[in-house]
Every structure is written in C-alpha cells, then in structure tokens.
C-alpha cells in the first residue's frame, strides 16, 4: 500500500489525517513542520504528501517548492490541507507545485476521495 507523508504543526490535525488514511489502508509517516518533512522526504520515498500551509520553520508552500526540486518528488501528488481558502494562497500553492487543495475542517471521505483521485 502507498505511503503518505502527513505534515501539520497541530498534533490533533496530524492524528486526524493519519487515522483517516490508516483506516483506508495507507501507511502514514507524520512530520511536525516543513523542515521535519523535508528531512524525512530526503531519507524515505513517499507516494503522496498532505501538508498544512501555515507552519513554523518552513510553511507548506515552501515545503512543496523544495520537494519539487528533488528528483524523486517531481511528479509526486502533493495536497495542501489548510484553513486558508483565499484565491491568492491557492495560486501560490499551485505555483509551488501543489496538486490539490482541501480546506479545513475537512470531511474524511473528501480527503480519501481526493487522495485516490490524485494518486490515480
């Protein structure tokens, strides 16, 4: 089964994402912020990345930009999971290489449906 990197500085949100994904059979690795995620992504390969936008140390947009620069992550689906619903943040995410966008609070079925869609 696919392995997904879940990135959020909120422990409760990470746990909710991980619980939803594990319940659907995915393997999940959690990261507390963009720096933690980048370190994990350099040492392990992930099939999909789900990241918050607003985080300390390295935000989700910077994380996606940095991951896209790595050869292993040029085509990896990357979803932004955030309270930010504004058009300019969405555009920044797209420009950085985000595959999709889910607004918090999210519906677990919506998260799974979106993951399945972007992972083909």
For each feature predicted by the language model, list its residue ranges.
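Active-site beta3 strand of CheY-like receiver
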Residues: 45-50
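Short hydrophobic/Thr-rich beta-strand motif most characteristic of the beta2 strand and flanking loop
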Residues: 25-32, 40
């Amino acid at each position: 089964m696919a392995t997904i990197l879940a990135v959020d500085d909120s422990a409760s949100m990470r746990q909710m994402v991980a619980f939803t994904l594990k319940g659907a059979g995915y393997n999940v690795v959690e990261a507390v912020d963009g720096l933690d995620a980048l370190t994990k992504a350099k040492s392990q390969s992930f099939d999909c990345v789900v990241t918050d936008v607003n985080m300390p140390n390295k935000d989700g947009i910077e994380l996606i930009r940095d991951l896209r620069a790595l050869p292993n992550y040029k085509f990896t689906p990357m979803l932004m999971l955030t309270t930010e619903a504004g058009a300019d943040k969405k555009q920044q995410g797209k420009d950085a290489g985000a595959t999709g966008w889910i607004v918090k609070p999210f519906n677990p079925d919506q998260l799974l449906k979106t993951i399945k869609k972007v992972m083909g």
